[in-house]
Amino acid sequence: MPKIVIESHIPYVGNAFAGVADTTFLPPEGITPEAVRDADALIVRTRTRCDAALLDGSRVRFVATATIGTDHIDLGYCRDNGIEVVSAPGCNAPAVAQYVWASVFTLRRDDWQGLTLGIVGLGHVGSIVADWARR
C-alpha cells in the first residue's frame, strides 16, 4: 500500500485515504528527510519547504499542496526528478468572497436600491462576489 505523509494542520483530511494508503500525520517541523524517506506522496501547506534538502533519497513521486501557490516547492527540482506537483488554486476564494461581502455590509448598512457595485477583476474571488451580487 502506498505511504502518504500529510501535514497535520491541514483540515478535513481525516480518513480520506483509509483503505487505499498508509497515512502518517506530522506537524510541519516533523516533516524531515527521515520522515519522508519511504513515503510515496506528501500533502503539505506553505510551512513545509519541498526541495532537494527534503526529497533527495526519498521515494516521493507526488507532492500536493493544500494552498494556492507553490513558492515553497522547488518546481524545477521536482520536474527534473519525476515528482508530480499539484496545488489548489481557488481553494480559499469562497472565504475571501465572504470577507468582501462582510466588509461591504459593514460599510454600507442602509438601502442598496440604485447603487452600482464595482468589481475589479473577475477571477476566482471576483466571479463569486459578482454571482452573489446577482442573487
Pin down the residues of each PLM region:
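Short loop/helix-cap segments at secondary-structure boundaries that form the rim of catalytic
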Residues: 13-20, 33-36, 53-57, 73-80, ...
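Phosphate/diphosphate ligand-binding glycine-rich loop within oxidoreductases
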Residues: 41-111, 115
